[in-house]
């Protein structure tokens, strides 16, 4: 995580650092555990030591954070790489790119109750699954279903 904070600091330092530079950082989701390092850096004064005044804004999903950066409303943001790929597919030439991978193995999961008979991927057939439409992990479900011989028409 220390390397990640150093990286974010170096990106933020690319902005003029002679006076306190105000910069907005768009999160992909609400203030939760994964965003703790950013707040830690603020609380410990790491950004301030570099003359940066960082404001962190909560998001509503990766497909909320990415357009904020692409339109210039925010100079930097945090988002799921799968959502960025989807965004760039729908918006070719958009001026946004990934500069660092934070999670090389994201913790995507399907949670099911054993008491309801969900113990293997194929047990999902006949069940109802829910995910928000812009969810980057949900985009992974079709290949997951295919790899596990799940008939998505039965879900």
Regions found by a protein language model. Give the residues of each.
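Short, glycine-/small- and polar/acidic-enriched structural segments
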Residues: 22-155
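Sec/Tat signal peptide C-region and signal peptidase I cleavage site
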Residues: 15-19
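Bacterial N-terminal signal peptides
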Residues: 5-14
């Amino acid at each position: 995580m220390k390397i990640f904070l150093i990286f974010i600091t170096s990106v933020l330092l690319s902005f003029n650092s002679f006076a306190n530079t105000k910069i907005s950082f768009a999160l992909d989701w609400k203030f939760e555990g994964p965003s703790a390092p950013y707040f830690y850096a603020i609380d410990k004064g790491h950004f301030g030591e570099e003359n940066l005044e960082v404001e962190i804004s909560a998001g509503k999903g990766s497909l909320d954070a990415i357009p904020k950066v692409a339109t210039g409303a925010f100079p930097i943001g945090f988002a799921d790489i799968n959502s960025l790929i989807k965004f760039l597919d729908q918006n070719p030439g958009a001026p946004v790119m990934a500069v660092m991978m934070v999670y090389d193995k994201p913790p995507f999961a399907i949670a099911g109750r054993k008491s309801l008979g969900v113990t293997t991927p194929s047990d999902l057939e006949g069940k109802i699954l829910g995910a928000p439409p812009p969810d980057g992990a949900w985009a992974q479900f079709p290949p997951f279903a295919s790899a596990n011989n799940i008939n998505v028409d039965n879900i």
